[in-house]
């Protein structure tokens, strides 16, 4: 049976950076790219907040650059996903989706987190053309424009406040008749003059010839006073949470109440020896490419130190 020193599950900034560091440490890493090679950044039209690209860079191109750099240092790239891990014994026995089995001394988990969407057909149609799940990433493109934020929790309020500092007008589309955010966040939102909260409102669709130009909304859905109306917007931001891709690890690796992998603070170390986590899968707070890359570097360094003690 094949044996490898370091297995990296998932690509994106965390996985590829871990691969670069692991390759340079001669760990001969094998990286499984997963269902979306390159991760969420491959759907981002332009990335302007990652160091080293003064004029910005296409998200897909940046991931291709990282992949090429990882390959240069000896990373073996494999398509597909890991479907099974035997956590009870070491070295860990692993199987991929094609049934190929092998063992590994260390595992770096970089499977990411998936933004939750409403499930509208239009969301996919306009993704990267007005639809976003990251105000910090894309808010700059909507300076002096009108945007909408979907959600009523802390994340939605944070996104709305951030966008309000850039945009001319921010609508908050809230399904319930109240906000679920902390009281201080609610107060800040309500005090912001360019934020308008649309309570008891659902999004039915988006429209526009060249990207998002507006949203079809319904107030009091399913009630006698149901009312359909449209708003003109340039950007549509989802802020209804992220789902970490941790199904494979449940019951074995410690997760928090949201399903994110718990790591020892300041490290990439999980509760299992030789298993490390990097990127959004272990980050319920920041979810930024540059942060993910840094955590990927930490995971690879820790994997190297772990192997040196074997």
Label each residue range with its predicted role.
Residues 119, 125-141, 240-291, 295, ...:
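FAD-site-proximal beta/loop scaffold in flavoenzymes
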